């Protein structure tokens, strides 16, 4: 980070913010055992809001699921983007 970026408060990109949020969610879930994934609907709404800035999509165009098998967790996000 440069001094100017620090002083002027350069805004983070939405992708890096989303990545940080996902990392926090995953770390929280792993630390807390196998609690229910009650954050998935909120995550889906936020994804729709971010992607809608660039492409016209609806809430039904995104599917978010979390699968657990033993000590492995898979967060799956499926996004249907309409053809141009």
From Swiss-Prot:
Gene Ontology annotations of biological process type: cell division; regulation of division septum assembly
Keywords, sorted A to Z: Cell cycle, Cell division
InterPro entries: MinE (IPR005527), MinE_sf (IPR036707)
Pfam families attached to this UniProt entry: MinE
Top-level taxon in the UniProt lineage: Bacteria
Gene3D superfamilies in the record: Cell division topological specificity factor MinE (3.30.1070.10)
Keyword DNA repair attributed: no
Family: Belongs to the MinE family.
NCBIfam families, per database record: minE, PRK00296.1, PRK13989.1
Function: Prevents the cell division inhibition by proteins MinC and MinD at internal division sites while permitting inhibition at polar sites. This ensures cell division at the proper site by restricting the formation of a division septum at the midpoint of the long axis of the cell.
Name recorded for this polypeptide: Cell division topological specificity factor
């Amino acid at each position: 980070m440069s001094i100017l970026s620090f002083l002027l408060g350069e805004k983070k990109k939405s992708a890096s913010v989303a990545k940080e949020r996902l990392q926090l969610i995953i770390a929280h879930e792993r630390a807390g055992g196998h609690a229910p994934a009650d954050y998935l609907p909120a995550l889906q709404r936020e994804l729709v809001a971010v992607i809608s800035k660039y492409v016209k999509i609806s809430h039904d165009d995104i599917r978010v699921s979390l699968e657990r098998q033993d000590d492995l967790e898979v967060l799956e996000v499926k996004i249907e983007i309409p053809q141009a």
